[in-house]
UniProtKB/Swiss-Prot annotation:
Protein's organism: Pseudomonas syringae pv. tomato (strain ATCC BAA-871 / DC3000)
Residues reported in the UniProt entry to bind ATP: 17, 59-64, 254, 319, 391
NCBIfam families registered for this protein in UniProt: hslU, PRK05201.1
HAMAP family reported for this sequence: HslU (MF_00249)
Record carries keyword Cytoplasm: yes
Keywords: ATP-binding, Chaperone, Cytoplasm, Nucleotide-binding
GO cellular component: HslUV protease complex
Transmembrane segments: none
GO biological process: protein unfolding; proteolysis involved in protein catabolic process
Any matching Pfam family: AAA
Quaternary context: A double ring-shaped homohexamer of HslV is capped on each side by a ring-shaped HslU homohexamer. The assembly of the HslU/HslV complex is dependent on binding of ATP.
Name by which UniProt lists this protein: ATP-dependent protease ATPase subunit HslU
GO MF terms held by the record: ATP binding; ATP hydrolysis activity; peptidase activity; proteasome-activating activity
Coiled coil regions, renumbered to chain: none
């Protein structure tokens, strides 16, 4: 990650409106990963990541920041919900499975990167195998150079036709590695054992091939994947993945507020305080056994987030609060924010609906006054009923364009027809009554 904090924030601004404090905190944390790697070895070991706690109502961008961060980081990243885990000893997943999933994510990420590096060699090898199936190699004569014989004019002609896609529909018989897939169902919390059994059965069937009749296009894809897999060194990959997890891994824990003990409620709750206590060693730094070997979590960055509607950050156990030193508060959305969300982000909601209906030959145009009125209604409904943030816009837009979407094929008469204008009057006629009637909006919007 060589992007500066300013560049990271600029990239996040393309998709997320507002919440500058959260973006800055995340950008600095991400950049500090790179800064740490530039330090001398003895100092690098001492620098631990400053974990982040994002606090804010639902639908304001907490999860979206995590999603976009995953794409920017180019590092092992996993997003989990705190509610899915239970205390060790109870039925369900324990928190150590987070690190095992992170290890899987690292292997997948690095394998994809390695396959990109060997792509050209894999394509050449795949082409040769397809050509061998199309044109069995000629028998080498006395005093004849084998390379010359194999690279005959006919073979070169077929190679050219193969690359141009002229042979895509031709059927060939080719030897393909036989995949030994075994579906194993196991109760929650036993995923590790399931994975080990699946790996065992997969290794037992390794190297077995099966003759299949396929079209050239399908065969080329399968053979290319096979050849790329052969060129990737699995042992090297595991070593690199282990380092990537330990030094660059990022874990995003959503819904952390749901495992906070609310107020002074008594009684034992397996899914709450126990989960928090299990998270402590993970965030502080411990060793977890994974398929890559023993993974140290000392330098993994943890970002936790929660709405904290029914509980407060102070309801988390004190030790966990101390391990999330950076606090960022995300603000509730204003009507102006809703207006910007509808138009500014890359692939905004209005653009998505416009392009979806264009596939039917129907043009729609969102007018500025229509967008403004839609934003006002979204804010009003959120204030009167439950505040679900930007997710309210999805509900409103579906309701607003329901009739147009249903009749799109009939309405698209000619390419030159004037677009349907979504202005303030159109919005009021379709949503005005629902927005004004609190009882109706509570159930429908």
């Amino acid at each position: 990650m060589s992007m500066t904090p300013r560049e990271i924030v600029h990239e996040l601004n393309r998709h997320i409106i507002g919440q500058d404090d959260a973006k800055r905190a995340v950008a600095i944390a991400l950049r500090n990963r790179w800064r740490r790697m530039q330090l001398p070895e003895e100092l690098r070991v001492e620098v631990t990541p400053k974990n982040i706690l994002m606090i804010g109502p639902t639908g304001v961008g907490k999860t979206e920041i995590a999603r976009r961060l995953a794409k920017l980081a180019n590092a092992p990243f996993i997003k989990v919900e705190a509610t899915k885990f239970t205390e060790v000893g109870y039925v369900g997943r324990d928190v150590e499975s987070i690190i095992r999933d992170l290890a899987d994510a690292a292997i997948k990420l690095l394998r994809e990167q390695e396959i990109v590096k060997v792509r050209h060699r894999a394509e050449d090898a795949a082409e040769d195998r397809i050509l061998d199936a199309l044109l069995p190699p000629a028998r080498v004569g006395f005093n004849e150079d084998p390379a010359q014989s194999n690279d005959s004019n006919t073979r070169q002609l077929f190679r050219k036709r193969l690359r141009e896609g002229q042979l895509d529909d031709k059927e060939i018989e080719i030897e393909i590695n036989e995949a030994v897939g075994v579906d194993i169902s196991a109760p929650p919390g036993m995923e590790e054992m399931t994975n080990q059994l699946q790996s065992l059965f997969a290794n037992m069937g390794k190297g077995k091939t099966k003759s299949r009749k396929l079209k050239v296009k399908e065969a080329l894809k399968l053979v290319r994947e096979e050849e790329a897999g052969r060129l990737v060194n699995d042992e090297e990959l595991k070593v690199k993945a282990l380092e990537a997890v330990e030094q660059h891994g990022i874990v995003f824990i959503d819904e952390i507020d749901k495992v906070a003990k609310r107020g002074n409620s008594g009684g034992v709750d397996v899914s709450r305080e126990g989960v928090q206590r299990d998270l402590l060693p993970l965030i502080e730094g411990c060793t977890v056994n994974t398929k890559l070997g023993m993974v140290k979590t000392d330098h993994i960055l943890f970002i936790a987030s929660g709405a904290f509607h029914l509980s407060k950050p102070s309801d988390l156990v004190p030790e966990l609060q101390g391990r999330l030193p950076i606090r960022v508060e995300l603000k509730a959305l204003s009507p102006q924010d809703f207006e910007r969300i509808l138009t500014e982000p890359h692939a905004s909601l209005t653009e998505q609906y416009r392009e979806l209906l264009k596939t039917e030959g129907l043009k729609i145009e969102f007018k500025p006054d229509g967008i403004k009125r839609l934003a006002e209604i979204a804010w009003q409904v959120n204030e009167k009923t439950e505040n679900i943030g930007a997710r309210r816009l999805h509900t409103l837009l579906e309701r607003l364009l329901e009739e147009v979407s249903f009749s799109a094929g009939d309405l698209a008469i000619s390419p030159d027809a004037a677009p349907i204008e979504i202005d303030a009057d159109y919005v009021n006629s379709h949503l005005g009554d629902l927005a004004e009637n609190e009882d109706l909006s509570r159930y429908i919007l």
